[in-house]
Amino acid sequence: MAYRELKQKHRALREVFHTNLSLRTHRALSWLDRAEQSAGDLDAQFIFLWIAFNAAYATDIDEQYRSTEKGMFESFFKKLVDLDSEDRLYHLVWAEFSSSIRVLLDNQYIFQPFWDSHNGKVPEDEWKQRFQLSKRKAANALGNRDTVQVLSVVFRRIYTLRNQIIHGGSTWSSQANRSQLNDCTALLFKVIPVLIDLMMDHPEQLWGDAFYPFLADD
């Protein structure tokens, strides 16, 4: 499932959607479309796909919670997995991407405490302990086929990669991060269309106010 099919569905159903859901999916689809048009530029595809994800999931929350954005992933994915009667996300995690997910979870370069230690914010032994703990938790989630927890951990790692690129911590088309960028982009290309489709299949759910609502000109 790709942009064209999802956009046709959006056009057919948007009149019955709540304004917030219609806006979220419209924005997310626009960035998915741009990612599909950026074949050959992996960095651009990753950026556009992350914006598509953010457009779909982000909510306007109190200022005190904005520093804990990563903690929001779990509740979002739990909602989607609970609504996924065809187990599409389960299939993606366990049948299509299980190998690359294990590689991502073992990659220290997309584990934020590693960089915090490198920048002198935490001791080296602390990041290593946290990395081992994170891997044990991830291994437990993998062993239990806990789709929600695995997706949440993976997206926290993707979020670190997103920070590296968006905040200028990476060179365009650099060979230094190609492996994780390839894996993350491939995963996003499959997960994002499914989550947009699930949201459109369940307009009765409360998806929350758009973080930046559309304001018509006076």
Describe the residue ranges of each PLM region:
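Helix-loop junctions and short alpha-helical segments
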Residues: 1-20, 49-141
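Short amphipathic alpha-helical segments and their helix-coil junctions
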Residues: 22-40, 138
